[in-house]
Amino acid sequence: MRSFFLYANFDSMTNYRNLDADEIARLSAQFCQAEDWSKIRVAEGFTTANISHARFSGDITLGVFEKDILLPGGLKKKAGLHHVMLHNCTVGNNTLIENIPNYIANYNIGRDCYIQNVNLMLTEGESTFGNNTDVSVLNETGGREVPIYNRLSAQLAYIIAMYRHRPDLTERLRTMIREYSSALKSNRAHIGNGVYIINTGTIRNVCIGDRCRIDGASRLDNGTVNSNAEAPVYIGPNVTAEDFIISSGAYVSDGVVMSRCFIGQACHLAHLFSAHDSLFFSNCQGENGEACAILAGPYTVTMHKSSLLIAGMFSFLNAGSGSNQSNHMYKLGPIHQGVVERGSKTTSDSYILWPAKIGAFSLIMGRHVNHPDTSGMPFSYLIEHGSKSYLVPGANLKSVGTIRDAQKWPRRDKRKDPNKLDCINFNLLSPYTIQKMLQGINTLQGLKKTSGETSETYSFQSTTIKNHSLEKGINLYTLAVHKFMGNSIIKRLEGGAFADIDDLHRRMKPTDCLGQGEWIDLLGLIVPKQAVSNEIEHIVSTPGYTLEETEAFFRDMHKRYYDMEWTWVCDVMPRWYGKTYEQLTPEDIIGIVKKWNESVVALDRMLYDDARKEFSMVSRIGFGVDGSTEQRDFDFEQVRGEFESDAFVKMVCKHIEDKTALGNELIERLKSLANRM
């Protein structure tokens, strides 16, 4: 496996020749110098017309310089070399390099590039250009290092960082990455085709892919920018980066400072954001704040000043202003870590003292210092009140914000590269979250039984649950499980009429052998734990196993998700419905669909009521500043619109209608089958 651009800059079929005496004379007359003219080779068709004030040393290969380069503002410049010193360089056709205060050394530069006012650009010694750099995620003192490389995915990073209980696996994966990186080792860096670099400080030991634009960066040291024509990378003013890899489609600008970082596809870092020892995967956004030793899965977003993400694993996170965590208890150093599972939010000024583990799709409000573990209670509120951490199980299931997040994530996938590195499952309800709800129902019922139904509060994993919150949590989780199970059954039974009961059961028969048991979230990829365990054994027991095979495994799991999900649903049916899929009658399924419809409508009604709060009288405070009550209401409606015409509200209403119709259609087909039995 090789970096995609390193060997694509120059046409191997091009014939190169030495300069003739007349060309040397003309170049000398144009204020050019060479340490040894015989070491300069040029392409057929080369002319000296567009080269002036250039100095050459070492082995030099030049293309032809005959086309105009169109610059922003409509300015045209002829390709060529002006006021530059080149040492051991290859320059492709129709590239313009000018006004280089120091020099360019040991670089292969592609065609159609524009390099202007770059202080210094060189390759020093042999380099792997950021590949195989160890990044100390989660534990600042080490122990979970992930070696980065050009094609690192969120899924592979998760396994390397989190599966330290399998040292044989860790060492095997590290060896593969080390071998991959060794194959890239070179004493010459490469710049792809159509690259634009201006007004930049020092670039040292950095490979840059096609169509990259670097404008005003301060210093880039030991890295790779995996830009390509489909998904160019932009690096803007005052960026300082060392020991890094930046993936396709990324945007890094406005004073970003980073060290030992991997920046995933379509990530956006700007506005003085700083990061060290951190991995950011697809569509992450970081502005104004700081990240230290984090494993940031897809869609981790921190946009505000005074926000610090440290020593944690996150994905689909929305961090509020002033959110931070502590990994240091001033005893043995910054050795603690935390996990915030997918889809969570932190409110302004929230704080968590690590270690802690927060359940999926949770809302974190206030300060939490007692190390809560709420991973068994997804979709919950974790709220500080009177120095205690209160847990409200399932409350986020009825939050309009949760549903909006699920809708916007796919729309905000900015990856343009056809070769996507990360596998991302956007589903809110999945075997991963539903299994936790099933466990949550049992846990809450167990708390009620153990402590008594009349208890005002219950203790759970360093949190407090109020009595009414416990009851509501059981109800919300039950509705969500009915919704998910019904969704899966209805989807499975789509299509025409059923010939007979055997035909019904044939359609319900699982088609994938994987899916039973526990499911896990590999930073975006939702997958059965058994499948990962099987692949781990394959990795450690197969001498010729490659990184390409890990990529193929993750893609295969992603592709098979819905088939494996159905296997899981069938496995859960006896526990939830009291029957296997083979024992279900048409009447049973009709009852399931009716219960599903009731659950969907009930949850949608809650979302509807939650959305209505945004149109309450309280929400109108600040509108109609200088007017009457009527003017206030009119001002509000002009800005926010009316409740019934709100896009989300209309979506909820239509969702109720569509789901009801979908359920009724299946019920009619099942009734037809029942009448024929």
Question: Residue ranges of each PLM-predicted region?
Answer:
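Membrane-permeabilization and membrane-interfacing ectodomains
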Residues: R178-S186
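Glycine-rich hexapeptide-repeat left-handed beta-helix
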Residues: S12, A29-A34, V42-F65, I69-L81, ...
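Short, positively charged and aromatic/hydrophobic N-terminal segments
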Residues: S3-S12
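Long, compositionally biased intrinsically disordered regions
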Residues: N117, H385-M677
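Long, structured ligand/cofactor-binding scaffold of large enzymes
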Residues: H83, N88-V91, A183, T200
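Long, charge-dense tracts
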Residues: N102-Y103, Y107-Y114, N119-F129, T133-V135, ...
